Amino acid sequence: MSVFLFPNRIKDTDFSVTRQVIALLDQHGIHALLADELAGELVDTKAVFLPQQQALAQAKQVITIGGDGTLLRIAHDCLAQSKPVLGVNLGRIGFLATCEVEELPEKLARLAAGRYTIEPRNLLRADAPAHNWHQVAMNDVVLFGNSRLHPMDYTVYCDGAFVSRYRSDGVIIATPTGSTAYSLSAGGPVLDACAAVMVLTPVFAHSIHAVPLVFSASRTLTVVAEATNRDSVYASADSHSRCDLQPGESLTITTAVEQLGLITFDETEQFRAIETKLMRR
């Protein structure tokens, strides 16, 4: 069996955790595959170095070493090749990367023995028809004004029916997985990661009545950047790909057909993460 490792050079500066993972996998007869660009820094290990896409294709699972952002950076490649992901957390929070460094011996032993589950996570698909822009997001799709000097007007429709109009700095549409990220910071609810829903959260709305709204995952949301806006707004998916929308243009958000599998060892991992990483902060 082979596993592809995707370390974050900034988080694991000396590759000490990466080396530990390689050694532990080797103890269980598992080959660690890494991108060949890392060969010079890990040449003294038992890892196998290949071009990244080739390594991904040969691997049964993917292990990211960094934080939630590290997992998000490789998520699209994992999705394209249907590879489940285990995240090792070296970051500050770790809602996606739920394996802590001290848990590596136990959890990698369970991985080798096949004693784990793959939890499918819903993703969002964002479409901007006017720009032929199509993106998939694991956490969220965000619309935000290019000008920070004044709020923008956004109108939201669900399956073509008017829902609400917001005058706000922006609007976040998040998956249950992403509900603990930017949406939470903007006052959105924490959703069960397995729930078939999505949440729309306004950012700094100029209203006492603007509240987050939860929709079924089967719905189609359309957010219109109103023609009365003084400037364009931008849409982004997981803070990566970006598209500028002119006043009057719209963005459509649906639940993606694809799902990303996260490797878990306990069905209550999300709730333990909420208790330890949010409630105690």
Segments (PLM) and residue ranges:
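Short glycine/serine/threonine-rich phosphate/pyrophosphate-binding segments
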Residues: 14-15, 69-74, 180-185
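Short glycine-rich anion-binding loops that position phosphate/pyrophosphate groups of nucleotides
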Residues: 10, 68-70, 93, 177-179
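Short, acidic/small-residue loops that bind anionic groups at enzyme active sites
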Residues: 81-99
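Catalytic core of DAGKc-family lipid kinases
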Residues: 93-169
